[in-house]
UniProtKB/Swiss-Prot annotation:
Species annotation: Thermobifida fusca (strain YX)
Protein name in the entry: DNA-directed RNA polymerase subunit omega
SUPFAM superfamilies: RPB6/omega subunit-like
Listed GO biological process terms: DNA-templated transcription
Keywords for this protein: DNA-directed RNA polymerase, Nucleotidyltransferase, Transcription, Transferase
A molecular-function term among this protein's GO annotations: DNA binding
């Protein structure tokens, strides 16, 4: 088989080290990415219905790109910020 082997991207692009420079812990990274991926997924689901309750991707996307990959790129580029809730 000639040619170049496929390059896996997924969680390796963007690299975890770059993402951890933007957020304060790996736990907040997981929470932010999961919440944003759910928002992006809901946005795409609502497009066909004409409802635009959520904000779409803030970065250029490729066809068939996963919402989690989009969310991780948004975090790396500093387009998302996390606000901590103060205990009452």
């Amino acid at each position: 088989m000639a040619g170049t082997p496929p390059v896996a991207e997924g969680i390796t692009n963007p690299p975890i080290d770059e993402l951890l420079e933007v957020v304060d812990s790996k736990y907040s990274l997981v929470t932010m990415a999961a919440k944003r991926a759910r928002q992006i997924n809901a946005y795409y689901a609502q497009l066909g219905e004409g409802l635009l309750e959520y904000v779409g991707p803030l970065v250029e996307t490729q066809p068939q790109e996963k919402p989690l990959s989009i969310a991780l790129r948004e975090i790396r580029e500093g387009l998302l910020t996390a606000e901590t809730q103060e205990e009452a």
